[in-house]
């Protein structure tokens, strides 16, 4: 695919995600089905609650990941700068958008070592699609992607549904697992594997764990539906009808998270996919997530300014802190012991 076509596709994606009413879906994350048991005697000071954690040897001030968003649109440079600057200020992790376009064209789209200079102290994660990893140049792409942004780890994103539905998508996924194994064995940094909104199942998580992947991002259904996005940008009624049938396809985020954590309790997990606020964040952490990611929820702020991104996450962090306070949790480890009950099952 030509650089211009790839760039236009990325711009289309941004425009649609910024206007979610254009990509309608009804599936929800599942977090709305769960409630914390309220603690009326927390016996701690709100300001003393410790939200810090560590990722890939770096200290984070809160367990939040700015999930991968954009890496191939003309707007990407400013968006990624705003995100990186905010992540540095708040002590959050950041995953860059797909680096395919930057690797295959002469334009780096802002995905260079300059991004690391905006955010010298945070965990920064490079990002490539499974289709690129599975190509003949896959290992070279992986190494270059990490070097390009001086990353602490590489994210490999799995998006078979989106690829099957989009014009010019990568539809031959044979050998992807073997390619992931090669990258895991060859890279000097950890490898994280994520879905993009349809969720990871326990059998797939098992395959990835056996391949040596360090961390999984369940990236479940309930947030951005890439099937609906591709349906919105489809060039024909036929393509639109096929895509929109899958608008609610996938494993809801809470379900994917709980199932994988139960099956692999020692596997570090990221919960993303429709995380709305700090209460969803707290629920995800209590269900077994090590980190919680947001993308679409902060994209509008990221197109505006660093200050807007800071304002967005300041709200999320304060919501998380209050959730800890009202469950009597002085730290993230304590929050993971807080009682969650499914709505209707409370005793």
Swiss-Prot record:
Lineage per the UniProt record: Bacteria, Pseudomonadati, Pseudomonadota, Gammaproteobacteria, Enterobacterales
Cofactor: FMN; NADPH; Mg(2+)
Enzyme class, first EC level, given as a word: isomerase
Record protein name field: Isopentenyl-diphosphate delta-isomerase
Subunit relationships: Homooctamer. Dimer of tetramers.
Function description: Involved in the biosynthesis of isoprenoids. Catalyzes the 1,3-allylic rearrangement of the homoallylic substrate isopentenyl (IPP) to its allylic isomer, dimethylallyl diphosphate (DMAPP).
GO molecular function: FMN binding; isopentenyl-diphosphate delta-isomerase activity; magnesium ion binding; NADPH binding; oxidoreductase activity
Keyword Isomerase carried by entry: yes
């Amino acid at each position: 695919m030509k650089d211009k076509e790839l760039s236009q596709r990325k711009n289309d994606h941004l425009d649609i995600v910024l206007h979610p009413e254009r990509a309608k879906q009804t599936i929800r994350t599942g977090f709305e089905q769960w409630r914390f048991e309220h603690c009326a005697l927390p016996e701690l000071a709100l300001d003393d609650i410790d939200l810090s954690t560590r990722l890939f040897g770096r200290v984070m001030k809160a367990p939040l990941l700015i999930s991968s968003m954009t890496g191939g649109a003309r707007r990407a440079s400013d968006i990624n700068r705003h995100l990186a600057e905010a992540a540095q200020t708040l002590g959050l992790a950041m995953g860059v958008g797909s680096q395919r376009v930057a690797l295959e064209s002469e334009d780096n789209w802002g995905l260079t070592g300059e991004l690391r200079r905006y955010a010298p102290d945070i965990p920064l994660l490079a990002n490539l699609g499974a289709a690129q990893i599975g190509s003949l140049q896959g290992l070279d792409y992986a190494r270059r992607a990490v070097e390009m942004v001086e990353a602490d780890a590489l994210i490999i994103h799995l998006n078979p549904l989106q690829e099957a539905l989009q014009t010019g998508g990568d539809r031959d996924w044979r050998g992807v697992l073997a390619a992931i194994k090669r990258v895991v064995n060859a890279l000097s940094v950890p490898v994280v594997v994520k879905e993009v909104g349809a969720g990871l199942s326990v059998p797939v998580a098992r395959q990835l764990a056996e391949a040596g992947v360090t961390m999984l991002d369940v990236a479940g259904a309930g947030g951005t539906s890439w099937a609906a996005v591709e349906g919105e940008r489809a060039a024909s009624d036929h393509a639109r009808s096929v895509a929109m049938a899958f608008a609610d396809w996938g494993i809801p985020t809470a379900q994917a998270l709980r199932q994988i954590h139960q099956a692999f309790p020692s596997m570090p997990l990221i919960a993303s996919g429709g995380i709305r606020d700090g209460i969803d964040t707290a629920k995800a952490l209590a269900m077994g997530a090590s980190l919680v990611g947001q993308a679409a929820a902060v994209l509008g702020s990221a197109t505006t300014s660093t200050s807007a991104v800071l304002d967005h996450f300041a709200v999320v962090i304060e919501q998380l802190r209050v959730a800890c306070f009202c469950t009597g949790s002085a730290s993230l480890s304590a929050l993971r012991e807080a009682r969650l009950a499914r709505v209707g099952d409370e005793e």
